[in-house]
Amino acid sequence: MIGPERVFFDTAPFIYLIENHPEYYAPVSEYLAMCASREKIFLTSVITIAEFGVLPKRTGNLILLDNLTNMLRELNFQVVEINQDTAQLSSTLRARYTFLKGIDAFQLAAAIYTDCSEFYTNDKPLKNIQEIKVTVASK
């Protein structure tokens, strides 16, 4: 790959940061700082926004949505749309990896389609995906 490395962030790391998770806030924050110091490009997808928004809307804690929007903007995250090519890749991944859930397949497909070198998550089974390096948040 030519140019800076691209890292795709799954939904869980945003939840940990914005909600100050007692176990995962520090490691996710440190990982993000390390990536920033290496001038990596940050990406996520519209699926992250959809997944993240469920609990704040259910509980009425809409400030969390503002916090996500601000974080994405302040850290210059590129938010990837899902298109037909991504959908096709998603179905290919689900066909290959029978344990893969639909949402995870879309997130991974978005990362692969946008030439990310790494996928950052806390979903340990995703480490079995061969098409992209999967890094799991650790305590």
Predicted segments, located by residue:
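Conserved glycosyltransferase catalytic-site signature
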Residues: 11, 46, 104-108
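Structured helix-beta-strand junction loops
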Residues: 37-39, 74-75, 96
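Active-site neighborhoods of divalent-metal-dependent phosphate/nucleic-acid chemistry enzymes
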Residues: 2, 77-120
